Amino acid sequence: LGLAVPVVQVVASGRLLKLGVLVKAPDALERLAQIDTIVFDKTGTLTLGEPKLTNVDTIAPDDLVLAAALATRSNHPLARAVSAAADGVSLPTLTNITETPGFGVEGEQDGETLRLGSRIWTDAEGPAASGPELWLRRGTNAPVQFTFADLLREDAKAVVNHLSKTYDVVLLSGDQKPVAKSVAEELGITNWAAEQTPADKIAKIDTMTKAGKTVLMVGDGLNDAPALKAAHVSMSPASAADISQTAADFVFQGTHLGAVADTLSTATRSRSLVFQNFGLAIGYNFIAVPLAVMGFVTPLVAAVAMSSSSLIVTLNALRLGLKSGTTPWTR
């Protein structure tokens, strides 16, 4: 009876480790098996998080180096793309640089305030890009637009389609509405919201929780960390910001989103095996103890039977490690 739960947890954690998923909390699998709603971030979670700057040829060199100087203080995928576009170029020294998660980075050069970030953060009024975007504002000058392309993870559509059959799938993105809408439509996600700040994401998760939903949050950015903590259980890719990995209950390696589905499947099967093990152990004792009291079971037989019951529970848990057929995504 004492082995019913721990042996399943050990086998499940070992199986997930082979799949490149680290289980960080002892009760994480149990909580994951209870969820009915999955909330995805977009950039770096549904996408590869390796955006490329697409309009670099139309950006003035001075604007690019200033943007890169600000971007070096952020771990956001779009900021990394700006830094990569200015690789090898000498960057100016800025002062009073601060990052506001979910909005952007601010600094000063010769008394002039510089901001690199979202449309709202920079008070930009230009046309929205068809993909992710950042804006650079220099003092009172008109903001300069930086546009990016970020590919979806190879298995994102198949995984979302698979999960949608069992769970409510939600997309909460910090990007502009056209970008979030495009990704949601491509993946078949009907419940989505754009221009979400960290506070907005927490509010959405709290609303779902109060409505009786049990939420899994999957995100990678610095601005996702509060939402990861607010959710019932959370997952983050290994490429995520350190604070997001710290906040998450699971961390998965690689570029495949299938790790999320595999972890959910493992958690569900683990819970089923725990109940089976309890049933086997209790049923065994329910039958064996009365027989022993009535003298039908000798001490030798009882000793062998006790060891056998532990073996049965262990072997039942080991079934979790057996391959359960093919999955509809690339691993």
Q: Predicted segments — roles?
A:
Residues 113-117, 236-237, 314:
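Short hydrophobic-aromatic micro-motifs
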Residues 53-162, 166-167, 177, 186-204:
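P-type ATPase nucleotide-binding
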